[in-house]
Design a protein with these regions (language model features):
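Alpha/beta-hydrolase superfamily serine-hydrolase fold, recognizing
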Residues: 65, 69-75, 79-312
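A glycine/proline-hinged amphipathic helix-loop "lid/cap" segment
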Residues: 1-80
Length: 312
């Protein structure tokens, strides 16, 4: 059912498996503390977390190589048949402050298996131990390296949550620079406004089992550093219309029980207004980055649509 020319509601009610996953998640220790004070205390006392290791079976299932860009680790996975026609540069989420989660690896595998793509995963250094500039340098260097051996128009930028922010920010930097451009942009529940300024987000917060507005604002300030979190540089939702008009075809997937749904709708509308081929797919009662739970009906539909987008 189409609600607007650019927004498509993909489910009217959640699958039983997704409801079960949400119930389990709601009873676990949250990924991020739920109050600003708890988050600040956690960040001040934490031991720097490490990236979840890639499952050992991946080495048998895919052709895997590890390399460095901007002094940081990068992993590339090809199907056993060899490098694919399309190469996905995928940035994992984690609020810029958390490394690769174990749940991200099955999503990487599912994208390779369903879409037949090669995938490169930058394992970027996190803030505040590192900085936004270090993360941006890695993104820039990784794309430049891939573009040396692969047609840039056959590179798709992808990311979830803060990783969606990184993919989009990279696309905007490349557009402004005017050099080689990626062919497509796929965003899973992207974080678009670090300040979480829209009051409508407050109505979604009671339904979001992962994210809280105050904690996200703290993460955003930490990532922005000396910059203004509300600037177009830090919050792509506020990028200029001129810059947005330069973006490649874009698809966005966000659950309706995700704080980011409000800004996803606004951003898709902005892209449409400036002439970008953009679509937003929404899922009833789906939580933040629901597609990482790959056995669910909703995740399978996301991957189906991603495959169709790549094939267009």
């Amino acid at each position: 059912m189409l609600t607007t020319p650019i927004t498509q509601i993909r489910s009217q009610k959640p699958s039983l498996l997704l409801k079960t996953v949400k119930w389990v998640m709601s009873r676990r220790t949250p990924v991020f503390p739920h109050t600003s004070a708890e988050f600040r205390e956690y960040m001040a006392s934490r031991t720097l977390p490490l990236d979840a290791p890639m499952p050992s079976k991946f080495a048998q299932k895919y052709d895997v190589s590890e390399w460095e860009a901007a002094g940081q680790k990068v992993v590339t996975l090809h199907p056993k048949s060899g490098p694919a026609e399309w190469h996905m540069l995928y940035f994992h989420g984690g609020g810029f402050v958390r490394p690769m989660f174990k749940e991200h690896w099955p999503l990487v595998a599912a994208m390779i298996d369903t879409c037949g793509v090669s995938v490169t995963v930058p394992l970027y250094e996190v803030v505040p131990e590192s900085s936004h500039q270090v993360q941006d340098d890695l993104a820039d260097a990784a794309f430049a390296k891939l573009a040396e051996s692969h047609d840039p128009q056959k590179i798709i930028l992808n990311g979830d949550s803060a990783g969606g922010h990184m993919a989009l920010s990279l696309a905007l930097r490349l557009a402004r620079a005017g050099g080689p451009q990626p062919g497509k942009l796929a965003l899973f529940a992207p974080w678009l406004d670090l300040t979480m300024a829209d009051p409508a987000i407050e109505a979604v917060e009671p339904h979001d089992i992962m994210l809280k507005i105050g904690t996200l604002r703290e993460c955003g300030r930490m990532f922005a550093g000396a910059r203004d979190p509300a600037s177009g540089e830090c919050s792509p939702l506020f990028a200029s219309s001129e810059d947005l008009s330069l973006l490649p075809p874009t698809r966005i997937w966000t659950g309706q029980h995700d704080l980011f749904i409000v800004d996803s709708r606004k951003f898709a509308a902005r892209l449409n207004e400036v002439g970008v081929d953009a679509k937003l797919y929404e899922y009833a009662e789906a939580p933040h980055v629901f597609m990482a739970v790959v056995p669910t009906r909703e995740a399978k539909d996301t991957l189906k649509l991603l495959n169709e987008f790549i094939a267009e």
